[in-house]
């Protein structure tokens, strides 16, 4: 592929599919490159969108600030909740499902989600499908990291260059979707605002029109589920709008309305000063006439304001969220002619109404009584904390005019859905919130053990706009700050329900994997972890005032949903990561010992994974004796660490959980002890294999690749088969009908057609040059022969081959079905032979589509 300089990218950070987001960038790049078209190999390569890029208007921006668009038939109640989930989400997707060029050209079902860049050339242009004016359609606005730049990847060969496509493997999380336009037969009905959007800052405002309602979305919004009937026809129909062949670039004229009097939606906002970052309009005294000032973020109701638009006055009233009787007001009638702002009950005066004016990326708030008077941030300290805010005439000085500019931030109290979670500390690696049921009911931080002590069930209360967090260990106990204790203790305990506000928590998203957890009793109090040890072997968990700036309090949390069913039930081979030709094997030997053995593709090495919903773990059944299960005999008097195949006992030592690594492999952990993993040693067993143990040590052989039996890795198509080390060297045949490695000279004899036989779960590999001729296995260390495989003995296993994809290398291994221990490789003299499979470079190949 083309040789270009390395660059920084956010890659797959946006992915909503967890297994894709967890992969190393190198691994996912190999996965996407395996289907690269032959004709483009020398002139193109996979190009991720860089972290810093030159946008279509030639302005240098961060990738998170480049405006992308996606046309979709699915409504906000689905997209703002789940994000853009690709059609294909399963692990080990097949060849076509990871084919970037095929996806860009034909939009077939895949792991990708398509978007298009906003194109700017004095005016704004957007690629638009020709059927966007038919039925109910949504135009989603996206600011996401990473993704693959399709035009940059394929250059002049890009299938639809005017689409300016950015494709996202694994989809796009909801936090990167800012808004959506809802269109009915081409007419914009409303603009949806996503309150969970993670704003990178410095974005242009959402384009709006005074004639179009703006709506802040909430879960299960009654108007948020409008769906066109055609989107229900098939699983893939919602993606038809992004097919590059059915659209063109059109000018986006929506919102070209000077002095739009209604630039923001009605709803709940925080009003942030542009002059003083992280300072917000604040009504700290909840009384009639209470002074409004600018103060550092506290997460409290006193900094939340409810905007409502009056069509008659063409202005907004701004109501305090903490006290619905109080409104943002300028007491223009005061005898002192004061300029400060206060919270007053409704008077009907125009000094309680505000016109909101866009100033590029921000807003000014003008008082309706006197439109010359603008809300202005001051440097003067306020007696109530923070800084004073007044109304003042317009400032023209370019250096100080930002004191009259404000950012409106939609506020949402429900960033996560109800369910079970682990609460990981971001700063202190592998530490989670833990309740071990000790006598003092103390909740603390502890090393992650994947047990019910560390499971927390979040339930949202719409009255309090906050969460109750229930213990997984004891379902009647809630995470509680005992704020009423005489000692004014700051620790956190697990108490039965009291209906006190100190048992409610607000979850505030601060990053893609980062949250603050605030107590509703006092929103300045945040949950944090210190390095101080507790008597129970963990770390001290407490609440402290956010404004105190405690450097020793680690208060950022990654709240991870708990999901244990990583793979579908079915039959698998379990290959070792470090020794890729060794699989877990049970040969029914004395003592029921299970060991690692060179792969031979028989039932000894077949294992059936069966998920148990109650235990939330897998049982792993032998393929050779269906009444035996993969077991660690943890109860043996010798405390043995070996694995055995035993009949069902019901013990947790027969259950296993999968822990995904970042290269697509898994650690297999025993349910009885989270730290006990299946590991392969280099020690020989009496039965000809390698010893398997369960161990809490970090052996190098404790990660495994699961290959599902019966999956078809490649389609029935024609390919050149190139070596791993040099894609310009391919498998061809000699005049004596032996397979050889030659330079690719575009000969027909180096084109091979795959034909899959579903009964044998293997391929015939035919010559495209001579009818009926195909690959024939002769024996170990013999040439692979080209001969007639369509005769009376067509079913001979020597004519069939299995093909395995190697996630680590991005290449394929070709095994003989007749003798699966042997794989196709080549010698120094470039003869193609079969030998014991080792996954060495000379046994790995690229399949290049013709």
UniProtKB/Swiss-Prot annotation:
Protein name stated in the entry: Pierisin
Database matches in PROSITE patterns: RICIN_B_LECTIN
Native species: Pieris rapae
Tissue specificity as recorded in UniProt: Within late stage larvae and pupal stages most protein is found in fat bodies.
Family recorded in the similarity comment: Belongs to the pierisin ADP-ribosyltransferase family.
Function: ADP-ribosylates double-stranded DNA by targeting the N2 amino group of dG residues; 10-fold less active on tRNA. Induces apoptosis in a range of human cell lines. May play a role in removing unnecessary or harmful cells during pupation. May play a role in defense against parasitic wasps; its habitual predator Cotesia glomerata is only susceptible after removal of its eggshell or the surface of the larval caudal vesicle, while other wasps are damaged by this protein. The wild-type catalytic domain (residues 1-233) cannot be expressed in E.coli as it is unstable probably due to its toxicity.
Region (ADP-ribosylation domain): 1-233
Domain notes from UniProt: The N-terminus (residues 1-233) has the ADP-ribosylation catalytic domain. NAD(+)-binding or the presence of the linker do not alter the structure of the catalytic domain, however in vitro the presence of the linker masks the DNA- and NAD(+)-binding regions and thus prevents dsDNA-binding by the catalytic domain.
Effect of residue 187 to A: Slight reduction in DNA-binding by catalytic domain
UniProt enzyme class: transferase
Pfam family, one: Scabin-like
Span of the annotated motif PN (phosphate-nicotinamide) loop: 117-135
EC number of this enzyme: 2.4.2.-
Protein's UniProt keywords contain Transmembrane helix: no
Phenotype when changing residue 127 to A: Slight reduction in DNA-binding by catalytic domain
One of the GO BP terms on file: DNA ADP-ribosylation
Binding sites annotated in the UniProt record for NAD(+): 70-72, 85, 107, 114-116, 127, 163-165
Gene Ontology terms for molecular function: 2'-deoxyguanosine DNA ADP-ribosyltransferase activity; DNA binding; nucleotidyltransferase activity
């Amino acid at each position: 592929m083309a040789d270009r300089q390395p660059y920084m990218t956010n890659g797959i950070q946006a992915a909503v599919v967890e297994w894709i987001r967890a992969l190393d960038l190198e691994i996912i790049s190999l996965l996407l490159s395996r289907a690269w078209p032959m004709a483009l190999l020398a002139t193109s390569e996979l190009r991720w969108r860089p972290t810093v890029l030159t946008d279509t208007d030639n302005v240098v921006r961060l990738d998170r600030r480049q405006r992308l668009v996606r046309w979709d038939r699915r409504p906000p109640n689905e997209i703002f909740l789940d994000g853009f989930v690709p059609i294909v989400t399963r692990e080990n997707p097949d060849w076509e499902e990871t084919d970037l060029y095929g996806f860009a050209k034909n939009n077939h079902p895949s792991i990708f989600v398509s978007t298009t860049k906003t194109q700017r050339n004095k005016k704004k242009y957007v690629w638009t499908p020709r059927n966007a004016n038919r039925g109910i359609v949504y135009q989603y606005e996206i600011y996401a990291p990473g993704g693959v730049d399709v035009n940059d990847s394929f250059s002049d060969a890009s299938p639809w260059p005017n689409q300016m496509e950015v494709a996202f493997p694994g989809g796009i999380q909801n936090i990167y979707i800012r808004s959506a336009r809802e269109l009915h037969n081409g007419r914009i009905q409303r603009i949806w605002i996503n309150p969970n959007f993670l704003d990178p800052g410095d974005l242009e405002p959402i384009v709006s029109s005074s004639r179009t309602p703006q709506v802040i979305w909430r879960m299960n919004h009654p108007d948020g589920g409008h769906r066109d009937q055609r989107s229900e026809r098939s699983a893939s129909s919602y993606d038809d709008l992004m097919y590059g062949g059915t659209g063109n670039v059109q000018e986006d004229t929506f919102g070209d309305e000077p002095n739009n009097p209604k630039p923001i939606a009605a709803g709940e906002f925080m009003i942030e000063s542009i002059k003083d970052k992280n300072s917000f309009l604040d009504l700290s005294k909840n009384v009639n006439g209470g002074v409004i000032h600018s103060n550092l973020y506290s997460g409290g109701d006193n900094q939340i304001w409810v905007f409502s638009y009056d069509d008659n006055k063409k202005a907004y009233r701004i109501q305090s969220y903490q006290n619905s009787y109080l409104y943002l007001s300028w007491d223009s009638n005061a005898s002192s002619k004061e300029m400060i702002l206060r919270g007053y009950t409704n008077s009907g005066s125009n000094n309680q109404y505000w016109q909101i004016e866009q100033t590029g990326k921000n807003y000014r708030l003008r008082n309706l009584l006197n439109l010359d008077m603008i809300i202005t941030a001051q440097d003067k300290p306020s007696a109530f904390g923070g800084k004073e805010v007044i109304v003042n005439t317009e400032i023209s000085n370019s250096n100080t005019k930002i004191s009259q500019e404000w950012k409106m931030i939609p506020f949402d109290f429900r960033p996560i859905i109800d369910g079970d979670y682990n609460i990981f500390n971001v700063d202190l690696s592998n530490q989670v919130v833990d309740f071990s049921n000790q006598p003092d009911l103390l909740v603390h931080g502890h090393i992650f053990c994947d047990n019910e002590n560390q499971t927390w069930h979040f339930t949202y209360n719409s009255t309090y706009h906050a969460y109750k967090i229930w213990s997984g260990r004891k379902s009647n106990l809630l995470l509680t700050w005992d704020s009423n204790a005489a000692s004014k203790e700051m620790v956190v305990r697990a108490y039965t329900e009291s209906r006190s506000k100190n048992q409610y928590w607000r979850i505030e998203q601060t990053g893609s994997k980062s949250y603050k957890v605030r107590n509703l009793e006092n929103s300045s109090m945040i949950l944090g972890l210190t390095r101080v040890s507790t008597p129970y072997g963990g770390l001290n968990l407490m609440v402290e005032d956010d404004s105190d700036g405690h450097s020793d309090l680690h208060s950022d949390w990654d709240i991870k949903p708990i999901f244990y069913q990583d793979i579908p039930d079915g039959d698998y081979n379990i290959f070792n990561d470090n020794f890729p030709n060794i699989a877990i094997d049970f040969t029914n030997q004395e003592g029921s010992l299970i060991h690692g053995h060179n792969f031979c593709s028989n039932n000894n090495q077949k294992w059936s994974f069966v998920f148990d919903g109650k235990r939330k773990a897998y049982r792993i059944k032998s393929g050779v004796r269906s009444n035996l299960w993969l077991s660690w005999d943890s109860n043996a008097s010798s405390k043995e660490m070996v694995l055995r195949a035993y009949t069902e006992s019901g013990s947790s030592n027969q259950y296993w959980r999968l822990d995904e690594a970042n290269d697509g492999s898994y650690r297999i952990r025993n349910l009885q002890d989270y730290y006990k993993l299946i590991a392969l040693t280099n020690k020989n067993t009496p039965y000809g294999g390698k010893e398997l143990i369960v161990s809490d040590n970090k052996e190098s052989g404790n990660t495994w690749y699961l290959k599902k039996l019966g999956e078809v890795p490649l389609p029935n198509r024609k390919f050149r088969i190139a070596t791993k080390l040099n894609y310009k060297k391919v498998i061809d045949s000699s005049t004596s009908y032996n397979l050889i490695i030659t330079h690719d000279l575009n000969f027909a004899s180096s084109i091979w057609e795959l034909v899959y036989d579903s009964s044998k779960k293997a391929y015939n590999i035919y010559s495209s040059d001579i009818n009926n001729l195909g690959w024939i296995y002769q024996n170990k260390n013999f040439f692979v022969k080209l001969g007639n495989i369509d005769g009376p003995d067509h079913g001979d296993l020597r004519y069939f081959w299995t093909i395995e994809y190697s996630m680590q290398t991005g290449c394929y291994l070709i095994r003989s079905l007749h003798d699966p221990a042997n794989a196709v490789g080549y010698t120094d003299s470039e003869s193609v032979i079969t030998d014991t499979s080792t996954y060495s470079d000379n046994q790995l190949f690229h399949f290049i589509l013709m």
